[in-house]
Design a protein with these regions (language model features):
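N-terminal cap/lid segment of alpha/beta-hydrolase-fold proteins
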Residues: 1-38
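Gly/Ser-rich "nucleophile elbow"/oxyanion-hole loop immediately N-terminal to the catalytic nucleophile
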Residues: 33, 92-119
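Short beta-strand element of the alpha/beta-hydrolase
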Residues: 36-46, 114
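Conserved alpha/beta-hydrolase
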Residues: 42, 60-79
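Serine-hydrolase catalytic-loop signature spanning alpha/beta hydrolases and amidase-signature enzymes
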Residues: 46-49, 70
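Catalytic nucleophile-loop/oxyanion-hole region of alpha/beta-hydrolase
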Residues: 74-94, 100, 107
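Short glycine-enriched nucleophile-adjacent loop
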Residues: 122-137
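A catalytic-pocket lid/entrance helix-loop region that shapes and gates access to the active site
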Residues: 134-183
């Protein structure tokens, strides 16, 4: 598989496989100096269109350069479907060794599997490590850690707290709550 334009990962020392499993596109990348750890990346909201793609977040290059394997799924459909994101990402994590073997690279099972994502992907990463998902998912993965980067992973109480803090800060600073004319 050819490198994307501007990609700075050394493709001569990194195995890179892409395909479709269960209706979801995927990409898996494993450096020659693999440290035995796998990071699953979950992308953000992509609208409702039919095109299913795997993104190249900036953290990907850093992880591969540090010896981590990296994998990501497009999910089997677009929309704000956290469950589909969890299931498709977990299915890909479980297929990691099978994909490597099918491409001629025999690897030990990952010693640790992590999950991270941005925006809706952060919501998916957070949901993937919750007890409910671990108990009820069709594709069960027990992640060793998660870094969900998403503002909507809090509930309404959290947002009400943020709103109250904002209003209090504006009152203390003497800034009108609404409308704000000078940013």
């Amino acid at each position: 598989m050819a490198a994307d334009a501007g990609d700075t990962v050394d493709m001569s020392t990194t195995s890179r496989w892409a395909g479709v499993r269960g209706g979801a596109a995927y990409r898996v990348e494993v450096p020659a100096n693999w440290n035995g750890k796998l990071v699953m990346y979950t992308h953000g909201y992509r609208g409702t269109g039919a095109a299913l793609t795997v993104s190249n977040p900036s953290i990907r290059r850093h992880l591969i350069q540090q010896g981590y394997a990296w994998a990501a799924s497009s999910y089997s459909r677009n929309y704000y479907d956290v469950r589909a994101g969890v299931e498709d990402t977990n299915a890909l994590a479980l297929a990691f060794n099978e994909i490597a073997a099918a491409n001629g690279r025999s690897l030990a099972a990952p010693s640790k599997i992590y999950i991270t994502g941005h925006s809706m992907g952060g919501h998916i990463a957070a949901a993937a490590v919750e007890a409910e998902a671990i108990a009820n998912a069709r594709n069960k993965v027990r992640y060793h850690g998660a870094v969900p980067m998403c503002g909507v992973t809090g509930d309404m109480e959290l947002f009400n707290t943020f709103q109250a803090m904002q209003v209090a800060a504006q009152a203390i600073a003497g800034v009108p709550a609404y409308p704000v004319t000078r940013w």
